[in-house]
Amino acid sequence: MTLLGAAQIRELAAALDLKPSKSLGQNFVIDSNVCTKIVRTAAVGPTDIALEIGPGLGSLTLALLDSAASVVAVEIDSRLAGQLPITVANHFEHPENLTVLNQDALSIQSLPVNPTVLVANLPYNVSVPVLLHLLEKFGSLRTGVVMVQAEVADRLAAKPGTKEYGIPSVKAAWWAEVKGAGSVSRSVFWPAPNVDSKLVSFTRRQTPGDEVLRRKVFTIIDAAFAQRRKMLRSALSGLYGSSSSAEEILKRADIDPTLRGEALEISSFCAIAAVAPDIF
């Protein structure tokens, strides 16, 4: 196995006449050591089926193939999706272990196999929606490590009561425990992004309820953080008709109506949903 370095990445891009697209969030990892670190952090093993989103020119893909049983790579850019199998065949002795899907990760509803681990340099402009979509649709994903913008990583891994805690934190917690997993230098990307990057890891946990409850809980979360400085009785008044109605529901859920959304864990939002009327 030969991993790709900066020179090979630039050569591949030149051969494709590829200019990295800002709209697609294309910042390619050019440091093979970082790719190896990400795969190691994700603890990818020989029985794992790895799901990679936005494989780009294949630097992380090759590192994954070196550790996993197989890799499913989802790439929205048709040029990159077409080149990736060729690149892998030139650098890896078992190219059949790679499946490439030329699709938008946000629209994927099924995969040819059930992935067990997500490892990806997620497009920064859609990283949270993509992560939440994958956690929702693919229950076989037990663990994962993703690279995202530093501020997004902090929000995903934030705990109640912190300034970073918000909608991404609580919604991700419905499916998984999310933790920070280290920083990544801008210098490992081409082109270098204008923002800092971090890794976050997740471990799947038992969800608090079914899909009906999830949609109800997520609606409450959205309302609670729409104006995050408002007390919950005010923030939820739009959902339940008035502040007094919201206060009554909160008291039934054993939640202090004067708290703000940023103080509540996912279990507290579930408690509110359990006693609140349906809002669909």
Which stretches of residues belong to each language-model region?
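Active-site-proximal catalytic alpha-helix in oxidoreductases
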Residues: 226
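Catalytic cores of RNA-modifying enzymes
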Residues: 1-223, 251, 262, 271-274, ...
